[in-house]
């Protein structure tokens, strides 16, 4: 409260939507209290790394980003940068990237596309990880997106 923060971007699920939804559920922001009423400054990056860079530069005190930027061996942050940071809160699970197909695509073509993408799990995991940041799985779309839809509904009530 009262400190400057950065969000990954306004279009990020894990770097904006879910953290603000969590704040709304806790009553910290809402229809009468905006992000700028709670934080002294609210900045938006162009992605996870740019938000973390704002913390590393001292421009903000905290950033909302996906954990894959911070955890494990990755190309996003080096060990020296990670040593300057700490995780203060984790949320989730957060629905990951969703692949969509146009509604006029035939069922057989959808199956071909799905099988081709899923084959990357064993056939080319390095490419899969560079594109999707992890294993591809088939999920129930309504259940998978339930949290996102609820968070989006709350966003409409958030004071600008």
In which residue ranges do the predicted regions lie?
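An extracytoplasmic/periplasmic, membrane-proximal ligand-sensing/linker region
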Residues: 94, 100-101, 105-160
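Short beta-strand->loop
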Residues: 40-41, 74-93
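A ligand-binding cleft/hinge motif common to bilobed small-molecule-binding domains
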Residues: 20-25, 54-82
